[in-house]
C-alpha cells in the first residue's frame, strides 16, 4: 500500500496537482509502515510541491528532511541542495518585496550558512550586502563585501563590490580603506570619467588619512592620465608642490612649480583665472628661491669675481619677480614689487659690508 501511495504522490506532482500530491505524501510520511526510501521520496514530493506553490518556508523545511536522508555522494544530493538554497533565497526575495529589509538580509545570509556549496550563495551574499548598505549597517556590510571579494575573485560583480566598499568605508569614516577602494576604481574602471573622479577622491582620502606619499603618487598619475580639464590637473600639481614644500624637497618643489607655469602657459583657451592665479604664485615662489640664493651669496675677495656672481644671481631674481608681476594678480604684483626693492637694498648693504 505504501509503495502505491508513494508512486501516486509522484504521479500527482507530475500532473501539477500539488495540493493532492501534498496530501498523499503526508500520508506516507506519517505512516510507520513506510520504508526509509519511501519516506525520502514522499519528503521530496512534499518539498517540490510546496516550492511549486511558492510556499518557500514549507519547501525549505521539507528539503532539509530530504537532505538529511541522503548521502552527500548520492546522485541527486546536489540538486536537492540547490533547491534548499533557492527556497531560502526566495524567502529573502519575498521579504525584500514586502519592504522588510532586516528579514531579507537574514534569509540571504542563511543561504551561505545552510548551503555553503550552492551556486546561488554568491548572489545571496551580494544581495545581503545591498540590504545591509540600505540599513546603513556599514560594519556588517563591509565584512560581507570583503568576504565576497575574497571568495569570488572572478565574479563579474567585483567592480560593483569595490564601488560599494568605497561608499561604505567613506560612510564609516575610514579614509584609508575608502582611499584603497577608490584607487581600485581609478585604476580599473572602464569609464574614464569615473576613473578620473575616483583617482581624485582616492588622493584626497589618502591625504585625510595622512598617507602623503600615496596621495602624491595618485596626483602624479592624475596629471599624467588626465591633463584635461586643465584646471583640475593644475590643482593636482599644486597638491604635489605643497607636499614637497612640507618635506623640504626643494628640487621636486621647483620642478612641479615650473610644471604649473608651463601647463598654464601652453593651454590656450583652457586657461582659467584659477590656473593663472596658481601659475602666478608658482612664479613668485620660484622668484623667492632665486632671491634666497642671491641673498645668501656673500661678497668676498677678489671682489670683482664675487660681485659678478652676485650680480648674475641678482639679475635672475629680478627677472623672476618681473615674470611674477606680469600675471597681473594684484597680491603677487605687490609682493614682487616689494621684493624687487629689497634686492637693490640688499646689494647696497653687501657692498658696504665688503668694504669694511
Label every PLM stretch briefly.
Residues 1-356:
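Acidic, polar-rich low-complexity tracts and alpha-helical solenoid repeat scaffolds
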Amino acid at each position: 500500500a505504501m509503495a502505491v501511495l508513494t508512486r501516486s504522490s509522484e504521479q500527482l506532482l507530475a500532473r501539477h496537482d500539488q495540493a493532492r500530491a501534498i496530501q498523499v505524501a503526508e500520508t506516507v510520511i506519517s505512516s510507520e509502515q513506510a520504508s526509509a526510501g519511501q519516506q525520502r521520496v514522499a519528503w521530496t514530493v512534499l518539498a517540490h510541491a510546496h516550492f511549486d506553490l511558492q510556499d518557500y518556508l514549507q519547501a525549505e523545511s521539507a528539503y532539509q528532511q530530504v537532505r538529511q536522508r541522503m548521502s552527500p555522494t548520492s546522485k541527486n544530493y546536489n540538486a536537492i541542495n540547490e533547491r534548499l538554497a533557492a527556497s531560502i533565497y526566495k524567502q529573502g526575495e519575498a521579504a525584500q518585496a514586502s519592504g522588510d529589509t532586516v528579514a531579507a538580509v537574514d534569509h540571504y545570509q542563511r543561504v551561505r550558512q545552510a548551503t555553503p556549496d550552492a551556486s546561488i550563495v554568491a548572489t545571496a551574499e551580494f544581495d545581503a550586502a545591498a540590504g545591509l548598505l540600505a540599513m546603513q549597517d556599514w560594519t556588517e556590510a563591509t565584512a560581507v563585501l570583503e568576504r565576497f571579494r575574497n571568495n569570488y575573485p572572478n565574479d563579474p560583480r567585483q567592480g560593483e563590490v569595490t564601488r560599494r566598499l568605497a561608499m561604505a568605508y567613506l560612510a564609516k569614516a575610514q579614509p584609508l580603506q575608502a582611499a584603497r577602494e577608490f584607487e581600485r576604481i581609478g585604476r580599473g574602471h572602464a569609464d574614464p570619467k569615473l576613473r578620473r573622479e575616483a583617482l581624485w577622491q582616492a588622493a584626497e582620502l589618502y591625504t585625510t588619512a595622512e598617507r602623503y606619499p600615496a596621495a602624491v603618487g595618485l596626483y602624479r598619475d592624475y596629471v599624467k592620465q588626465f591633463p584635461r580639464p586643465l584646471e583640475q590637473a593644475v590643482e593636482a600639481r599644486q597638491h604635489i608642490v605643497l607636499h614637497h614644500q612640507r618635506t623640504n624637497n626643494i628640487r621636486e618643489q621647483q620642478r612641479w612649480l615650473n610644471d604649473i607655469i608651463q601647463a598654464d602657459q601652453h593651454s590656450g583657451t583652457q586657461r582659467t583665472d584659477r590656473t593663472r592665479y596658481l601659475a602666478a604664485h608658482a612664479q613668485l615662489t620660484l622668484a623667492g628661491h632665486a632671491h634666497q640664493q642671491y641673498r645668501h651669496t656673500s661678497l668676498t675677495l677678489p671682489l670683482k669675481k664675487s660681485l659678478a656672481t652676485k650680480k648674475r644671481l641678482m639679475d635672475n631674481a629680478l627677472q623672476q619677480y618681473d615674470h611674477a608681476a606680469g600675471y597681473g594678480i594684484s597680491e603677487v604684483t605687490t609682493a614682487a614689487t616689494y621684493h624687487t626693492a629689497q634686492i637693490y637694498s640688499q646689494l647696497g648693504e653687501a657692498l658696504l659690508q665688503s668694504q669694511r
